[in-house]
């Protein structure tokens, strides 16, 4: 029997790449071949993909960036990417093509549309990204990570949840150690691209905590490269035990060990936090398209597993108060952890696998 081929296309952020990685792991176990099409930014996240994943980089571009000349070159680059991908697909025909969003997914989805191949998209957020918005009515279905998801008329949406990596599933529902008079871990995540506002506000908020609480904290803080030195220096000057990095390869482990997570509310972060089950303070990105990061928080916040602070209300004083409220109330923190866990969809990958297999079977002669 011929080995089936899944072609995945994903843009260059962790929010797109991590669900693709989870699907790759599962489909390889099912005996499928798996190809990943991404751009140089996305290639930074491929170190965690199974080694059997066939990875190619494509020509694409982001419409929103650059001056007039740069923007004038976008369409030719994307057209070249679609043409190149169509040639590859003719030589090595995928059984299913799935896009996870981001401009680098345009060549694969565009070529699959031209060739009439079975195709679908996975949308991680409660509001469709620009690329997924364009293709939502041109694919068989939209697998949705958050429900409800705003979909255009004519699009077929199915709730599957957001797939999480094997390293997250290994820690699914890991026992929560409530805060107390002993070393506690606090994880600060700005999403795969970091977040300057967290680097501006969080260190000061931690420094403003009572010394009786602050002395127990061990902070892991993800920051942009340009912010690393000043953030690390601030923690050092304040006598706070902190590790500052641009990217933590062991985020699932750090979430599991944390008494509290402070994070942006990208879809992958929300999925990881809820599947493992940890209290969180979430600060949605104010400029996120369609305010999708606020939409992503609804399930966790309404269940009582998270505290949401809009960027407009974020300052050191208010954040310090919320941190203290969680870390000085062991019973309340434990309830938050259980509530977060109740919102997780640990079988999201299996649900997405089922949709891929269904689409493949529907298209079979």
UniProtKB/Swiss-Prot annotation:
**Known EC number:** 2.4.1.227
Q: Topology versus the membrane, per the UniProt entry?
A: Peripheral membrane protein
| GO MF annotation list | UDP-N-acetyl-D-glucosamine:N-acetylmuramoyl-L-alanyl-D-glutamyl-meso-2,6-diaminopimelyl-D-alanyl-D-alanine-diphosphoundecaprenol 4-beta-N-acetylglucosaminlytransferase activity; undecaprenyldiphospho-muramoylpentapeptide beta-N-acetylglucosaminyltransferase activity
Which Gene Ontology cellular component terms are annotated?
A: plasma membrane
Q: In which pathway does it act?
A: Cell wall biogenesis; peptidoglycan biosynthesis
According to its UniProt record, this protein's enzyme class is: transferase
Where does this one sit in the cell?
A: Cell inner membrane
Which SUPFAM superfamilies does UniProt cross-reference here?
A: UDP-Glycosyltransferase/glycogen phosphorylase (SSF53756)
Alphabetical GO biological process terms: carbohydrate metabolic process; cell division; cell wall organization; lipid glycosylation; peptidoglycan biosynthetic process; regulation of cell shape
Q: Which UniProt keywords apply?
A: Cell cycle, Cell division, Cell inner membrane, Cell membrane, Cell shape, Cell wall biogenesis/degradation, Glycosyltransferase, Membrane, Peptidoglycan synthesis, Transferase
**Which PANTHER family does this entry report, sorted A to Z?**
GLYCOSYLTRANSFERASE, UDP-N-ACETYLGLUCOSAMINE--N-ACETYLMURAMYL-(PENTAPEPTIDE) PYROPHOSPHORYL-UNDECAPRENOL N-ACETYLGLUCOSAMINE TRANSFERASE 1
* Function of the protein: Cell wall formation. Catalyzes the transfer of a GlcNAc subunit on undecaprenyl-pyrophosphoryl-MurNAc-pentapeptide (lipid intermediate I) to form undecaprenyl-pyrophosphoryl-MurNAc-(pentapeptide)GlcNAc (lipid intermediate II).
Regarding protein family, the annotation reads:
Belongs to the glycosyltransferase 28 family. MurG subfamily.
Q: What is this protein called?
A: UDP-N-acetylglucosamine--N-acetylmuramyl-(pentapeptide) pyrophosphoryl-undecaprenol N-acetylglucosamine transferase
